[in-house]
Amino acid sequence: SWYDNGDQKVFGSQSPTLLDNGNVLLFDNGSERPEGNRSAAVEVDIKTGEVVWEYVTNHTASFISYRQGAVQRLPNGNTLITSTHGGHLFEVTPEKKVVWDFVSPFFAGEGKCVATEEDAIPLEFHKNGMKNLVHRAYRYGADYPGLQGKDLGKKSPLVEGCPSFYKEYVKAETKAEAPAPK
C-alpha cells in the first residue's frame, strides 16, 4: 500500500498502469480502510505522490471489490473500471460521470437473469462478493486485429430471456480506440 507522510492512502492496489503523462493509474480495493471499505480508481503523480484524479462513489455497496480489480485509461480520456466482486464493469469520464455500466450475468458459469443468495460467495472465501467475478476487462476498438472480418453490428442477448445487462448513459466517444493490452 502507498503511504504519504505515514498516512495510508491506498488499501490494496491492483492493476498499476504507467500513463503517457508519467502518472500511475491503479485500482484501490479499499478493503480494511478505517473509514469503511470502498474501492476507488486512482491516478497518482509519481513525482509528487499526490492523487491527481480519483473515482469513488458515495454508495460503498455499489463499488467495492475486496480483492482484485482493474482499470484501463481509454484513448478518449475515460477510464474503464473492473470491480471484480460483483462482476461490475463501468466506464467513467474524467469528470467522473458514468457513461457505460455492465454487470456480468454469469454466476459460476451459469447465465442468470436475477442473482439470489445462493450466488453469493461464502464470507470465509471473499468479502462482499458474488459468484460472477470478473478479474479484468479490456476495451478493444473496432480496428483491433482480432475483430477484423467480424460483424460488430450483430447483437444477441447474453442470456436468453433476460433483459440487457448493460446501460449506455450517453454515447461514448469512439474516434480513438484503445490499443491492445500488453
What are these regions (language model features)?
Residues 1-182:
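Histidine-/acidic-rich catalytic cores in large beta-rich domains
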